[in-house]
Amino acid sequence: MEQRAYYSIREVTEMICNDRVLVLTALDETLSQLPTGNWIGGIANQNEVTYNEEGEPLLIQVNDLSQWVRSVHINSYQSFNFESIEKDAFTNGFSIITIPAFSSVHLSFAIYSATTPNWQHPVIGWIAGSECGTPKMRESVVVDGGTGEFYVERVVVMHCALYDNYKAWYDIINPFEPDLSKPRFKFPNASFNISECSVLENSAVEEGVKNDILNNTTELRTAFKPYADAHDIAIDAETTLITQLHGEYTTVSILMNLTGKSLILATPVIPGLSYYIGKRYLNEEDLFTVNADSVIFSVNCFYVPKPSPRSIASYGEVARFIYNHVAVRLHVSHSLDTIFGSKPQTAT
């Protein structure tokens, strides 16, 4: 069967029955028609429907990982056992995670990933949702294809063991950096909804400083939106807030600009962290060709060009932390290539 991005229910059913290892996105009523097997899935936006030669609608986005994976096990997790994600992973492998958008477990995972040590193996995935921030928004669900269970308050992870001669790694293509000419912000609560904030205005901007508290800093408590409006800070879907976690820039985008003083974010802010306004410093498409031959799976924000036709467009990109406005890519290479060859170029 030809490799393409979307397949019919019949075609995907055949793949599952042939023990293919699959990552799927579609509407929930479509995913509910599939048999159990080696797959995980998440709800997605409704795309324009195309048809195969048999006239069947191509409703399911498919990423087939069978070529590299010798075995899998699929688990679901709640906030009290996130630490088991690392424990359940294969020694030589990777894990694909999907999280229901704007659920309490989405919030909990954002906090957990920001406050725990680095994981020792690749975990990447996506925040699954459908028409989020619009009147057509559906309840966010993720699916454990091994059992057929649909979850609105659990994350689902497919742990994949690689064949012995392969190694997995990932990179993050992040086209944003902090705008040091603008103030920093702190928020009092871990939340998708922001209104009040503390503004940290520096009397002098120091080049190269990332998320450290500068000397001569004054703090102003105010409403975020009126402050942004008064200081010509754009508030729209492409506005990015940036903080630093374990030496890495992570990004948060605005999903909805509500009437009044509130904003709804695609990823929650974390109290105690300082957030900058982001500015674009490169064209992410320029990096898509770097190590492109080893990419087997990718996730991208709706506002980022797709690295490949099969890349999952998401409401959040997961690669250790949760990001917005980036692309994350999972690579598999022969072991010697990973050890002695070129390393991934990560733009962060």
Regions picked out by a protein language model, each given a short descriptive name:
Residues 1-348:
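Hydrophobic alpha/beta core scaffold segments
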